[in-house]
Amino acid sequence: DNRDGAIREDDGTLYVAAEGHEVAYKIENLCDRRYGVGADGLMLLDSAPDGFDFKMTYFNSDGSGGMMCGNGGRCIVAFAADQGINHFDFIAADGFHTAEIVSQEGRTKIVRLRMKDVSGMDRYDALTGVSCASEGCFMDTGTRHYVRFVDDLDQYDIVSEGREIRYDATE
């Protein structure tokens, strides 16, 4: 039974999902990789304003507020279903989202999530002051992403290149 809280993994990213704000102050300890569950973040399933089924509140593993995350959004929908919620129009930090569970086998659910439309691609990130290399850009899907264009994806070392981009302060 997942009614008291859940640890959800989606695409290699680990999240803790829980109801209400009673656990918010413990986020950093819960997510700690050595002494906690080692999660990438914590999401709270909260009551929402009229017109929505629930509110997703996302926190980064250090306890700071986070933005919408697609993997996390699918996980919170699966958790909401475990709580008896069967309609998935929800609000998150970036606005409205809708989802559906397209299949389920045992406790495994396949969730289709509608993300916000990307409004544009920028070569400069005003929030961080970072300029992109000519082969990439920033876009916002609820959370800022860096996208790099490549000619032959099969020959591209995604893991190494992704690690380099993520931890390079100039990109």
Give residue spans per PLM region.
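A glycine-rich beta-to-alpha transition motif near the start of alpha/beta enzyme domains, typified by
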Residues: 1-108, 147-171
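Internal active-site segments that recognize and position negatively charged phosphoryl groups
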Residues: 128-130, 134-155
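Short glycine-rich anion-binding loops that position phosphate/pyrophosphate groups of nucleotides
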Residues: 61, 118, 143-144
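Short, charged/polar, Gly/Pro-enriched secondary-structure boundary elements
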Residues: 119-123
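Solvent-exposed residues in well-ordered beta-strands and their adjoining turns
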Residues: 102, 114-118
